[in-house]
């Protein structure tokens, strides 16, 4: 009873701005960041008649644009983080609504339309996610910084779970209603349109957010947030420029396994193992659901082990899950990897984010955030482009081994670069 009362008290103390912000993040999680789009987009493209190489190229182009914009956007000072989020979400909304509409164009325009709308969506994602951490810090204060980021990860995971379930079920239901087989693209087109519509209220709420800092929590709550604060700069043997370059190099490699899962897991399950869309949706959803308690446990895990160790251990864990996929072509093995890698991604992402932000002065946080997002985009773009051709030329096992080796290399580099950081 005491525990329930304490949890209730903590949620009552969450500032209104954070509740509104979390609603926006929930809409993103339900639709594009782990939800409907994550389950159905690649399957939709397959049913339009394209193969893994085009899917890889399509994802690569969007992610490369995301990567190219992330670092410059992190250095922008003319616009506030709030304005950048509004611009970003507007582009995401337009791109998501536009992509499935291309099915009604002449077939000769399909590929170009898919690429153009995917690029617009990733332009929006770059504007948005580069400035999420700085924006959270502008609407919170002190101990709320890392707590809000932890709540953000949990919200994305829970919303992604719900969106994954909905995305897995809708094509079958719509196919029955429209008397169309699930091999037809139309039962996938309408859920993608629905995902875009769900973002409209989030965009409205985002415009009403104000960058007003909340009061410092009382001393009694100071121990509740156990994440190290980025304002406490570490002693480094590197310049800020060197830190940026190191973060980019390490993260591009470390993110490879996650990129393989995010881009090709549903393609492998559908095209390689002939798994039903319902089961693909369930596996994706469960990976997000398991991520909720993991995200909420971040403060405790960081206080127990530290961000540096968590980055290394979580990355090695993803490598250990990917290797069996190369040798055992079974949906249970692929499902375990999808769930394990997807669920732990919030812990890996947040621990790396807080660790990297703590390496630089406060005025350089947006730059570091941009460098981190750019490296994720570059890593995913590289995996998407190379992965599509690896599958075509050598099969899925070659892709899985490729991802595991590069991620392991990134972990070794992270250990070498930062093991002596105090």
What residue ranges belong to the model's regions?
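Juxtamembrane intracellular "pre-TM" segments in multi-pass secondary transporters
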Residues: 2-18, 211-249
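Central cavity-lining transmembrane alpha-helices of secondary-active solute carriers
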Residues: 57-75, 285-297
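Helix-loop boundary and gating motifs at the non-cytosolic
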Residues: 5-68, 243-276, 280-283
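Helix-to-loop junctions at the C-terminal end of transmembrane segments
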Residues: 69-82, 294-307, 391
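C-terminal ends and interior cores of transmembrane alpha-helices
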Residues: 90-108, 317-329
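C-terminal membrane-cytosol helix-exit motif in multi-pass small-molecule transporters
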Residues: 196-219, 413-418
């Amino acid at each position: 009873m005491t525990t329930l009362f304490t949890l209730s008290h903590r949620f009552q103390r969450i500032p209104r701005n954070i509740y509104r912000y979390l609603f926006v993040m929930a809409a993103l999680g339900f639709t594009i960041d782990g939800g409907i789009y994550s389950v159905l987009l690649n399957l939709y493209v397959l049913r339009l008649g394209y193969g893994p190489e085009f899917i890889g190229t399509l994802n690569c182009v969007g992610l490369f644009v995301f990567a190219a914009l992330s670092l410059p956007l992190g250095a922008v000072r003319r616009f506030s983080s709030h304005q950048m989020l509004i611009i970003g979400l507007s582009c995401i909304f337009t791109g998501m609504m536009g992509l499935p509409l291309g099915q009604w164009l002449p077939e000769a325009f399909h590929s170009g339309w898919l690429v153009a709308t995917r690029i617009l969506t990733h332009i929006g994602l770059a504007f948005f996610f580069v400035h999420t951490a700085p924006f959270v810090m502008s609407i919170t204060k002190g101990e709320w910084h890392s707590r809000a980021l932890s709540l953000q990860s949990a919200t994305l995971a829970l919303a992604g779970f719900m969106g994954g379930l909905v995305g897995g079920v809708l094509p079958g239901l719509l196919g029955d209603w429209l008397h169309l087989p699930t091999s037809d693209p139309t039962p996938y087109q309408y859920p993608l349109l629905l995902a875009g519509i769900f973002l409209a209220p989030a965009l409205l709420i985002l415009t009403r957010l104000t960058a007003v800092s909340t009061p410092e929590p009382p001393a009694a709550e100071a121990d509740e947030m156990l994440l190290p604060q980025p304002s406490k700069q570490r002693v480094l043997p590197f310049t800020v420029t060197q830190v940026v370059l190191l973060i980019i190099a390490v993260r591009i490699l470390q993110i490879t396994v996650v990129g393989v899962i995010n881009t090709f897991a549903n393609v492998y399950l559908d095209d390689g193992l002939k798994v039903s869309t319902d089961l693909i949706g369930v596996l994706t959803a469960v990976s997000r659901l398991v991520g909720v308690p993991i995200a909420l446990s971040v403060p405790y895990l960081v206080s127990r082990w530290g961000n540096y160790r968590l980055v290394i251990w979580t990355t090695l864990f993803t490598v250990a899950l990917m290797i069996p996929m190369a040798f055992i072509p079974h949906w249970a093995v692929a499902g375990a990897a999808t769930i394990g890698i997807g669920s732990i991604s919030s812990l890996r992402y947040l621990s790396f984010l807080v660790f990297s932000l703590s390496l630089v002065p406060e005025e350089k946080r947006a730059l570091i955030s941009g460098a981190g997002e750019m490296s994720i985009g570059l890593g995913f773009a590289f995996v998407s482009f190379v992965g599509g051709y690896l599958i075509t030329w050598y099969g899925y096992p070659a892709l899985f081994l490729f991802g595991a080796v590069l991620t392991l290399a990134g972990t070794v580099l992270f250990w070498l670069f930062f093991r002596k950081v105090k």
